[in-house]
C-alpha cells in the first residue's frame, strides 16, 4: 500500500500521477486502530441517522389543524402528541452532530500530526483517510436531505412556541424532559443553518486549528487540499477509476471532493477559489461537469451556495462562470 499515494503535486496528467486512495477496502494498521475504532463507533450509526431523516415526514397537517382551531383541545393535544416524538428524532440528529464533531477532531489530530506531511499521512493511514471521507460524505447527504425538508424547522418552532405557552399557563408538559431550554436553544441554532452538519464540521476544524497553536494551519488545510486532489485525479484518470469495483464509489468520491473543498473554503484564510489556493478548482468543477447532470446538480449547488469565498473579488471570472 506504500506506493498507492504519490506525486500529489504533479498536475500533468500525461505523466500519469501515481496515487490511489482505497476508499473501498482500506483496513487500519496497528497504529491507526485506536482512533479508527473510536470513529467507527460513531460512523456505524450514520446510515441509521440518514434513514430516519429521509423518512421524516413532519406534523404539518396536525399543526395546521391546531392553529386553525385554537379552542379545540383535542386538536391541540393531537398536534402536541405528533410533534413530541419528532422532536425526539431532531434531538437525536443534533446529538449525533456532536459525536461527529468529536470524531472529526480525533481524525484531524491523527492526520495532521508532525513529522509527516499530509501526503505521507494519507498514504500511511488510508483507513483514517477513508473515515474522514465517510464523515464528509455523510455530512453532504444529511444537509441535502435537511435542506429539502421544511417540516423540520416548522415542527421545532411549533414545539417551542407550545412549550413556552404551557409554561406560562403552568401546564405540565410531557416532552419538556426530552429537550430542556438550553438544549432547545442550541438545537434552534443548529437547524437554522442551511447546512447544519457542514457548519458543525467547519466550526470543529476552525476550533481544532485555534486550539493547536503549535501546529501550522497549513498542516490542516493541506490535508484538505490533498484529499481534494486525490479525489479529482482518481475520478479523471481512467486507470484509477477502473479500479473501483462499485459504481457507488464514483458518487462517493465526487461528494467527498466537494465536501472537502467547502471545508477548505471555510477554514483557509483566503479560501478555495483564490489564485494561491492549493486546490485546482477548475479541474474539480470540470470533473463534476463531466458527470451526468442530474447526478451532480446538488453538488454544484453546494459549491454555489455553501462556500464562503466564491463571490470574493479575488475569485477568477472563469471559475464563477463555470459555476453559473
UniProtKB/Swiss-Prot annotation:
Xref: InterPro entries: CYRI, CYRIA/CYRIB_Rac1-bd
Residues in cross-link Glycyl lysine isopeptide (Lys-Gly) (interchain with G-Cter in ubiquitin): 74
Disruption phenotype: Myeloid-specific conditional knockout mice have a reduced survival following Salmonella systemic infection. Upon infection, they show increased levels of several serum pro-inflammatory cytokines and chemokines produced by activated neutrophils and monocytes.
Lipid group attachment sites (N-myristoyl glycine): 2
Record field: transmembrane: none
A Pfam family the protein falls into: CYRIA-B_Rac1-bd
Source taxon at top rank: Eukaryota
Cellular component aspect of the GO annotation: cilium; membrane; mitochondrion
GO terms under biological process: cellular response to molecule of bacterial origin; negative regulation of actin filament polymerization; negative regulation of small GTPase mediated signal transduction; positive regulation of memory T cell activation; positive regulation of T cell activation; positive regulation of T cell mediated cytotoxicity; positive regulation of type II interferon production; regulation of cell migration
Tissue and organ expression note: Expressed in pancreatic ducts (at protein level).
Swiss-Prot/TrEMBL keywords: Isopeptide bond, Lipoprotein, Membrane, Mitochondrion, Myristate, Ubl conjugation
Lipid bilayer topology: Lipid-anchor
PTM section of the record: Ubiquitinated at Lys-74 upon Salmonella bacterial infection.
Subcellular location(s) of the protein: Membrane; Mitochondrion
GO molecular function: MHC class Ib protein binding, via antigen binding groove; small GTPase binding
Signal peptide: none
Entry-linked PANTHER family: GH09096P
Family: Belongs to the CYRI family.
Quaternary data: Interacts with RAC1 (GTP-bound form preferentially).
Function comment: Negatively regulates RAC1 signaling and RAC1-driven cytoskeletal remodeling. Regulates chemotaxis, cell migration and epithelial polarization by controlling the polarity, plasticity, duration and extent of protrusions. Limits Rac1 mediated activation of the Scar/WAVE complex, focuses protrusion signals and regulates pseudopod complexity by inhibiting Scar/WAVE-induced actin polymerization. Protects against Salmonella bacterial infection. Attenuates processes such as macropinocytosis, phagocytosis and cell migration and restrict sopE-mediated bacterial entry.
Protein name, UniProt field: CYFIP-related Rac1 interactor B
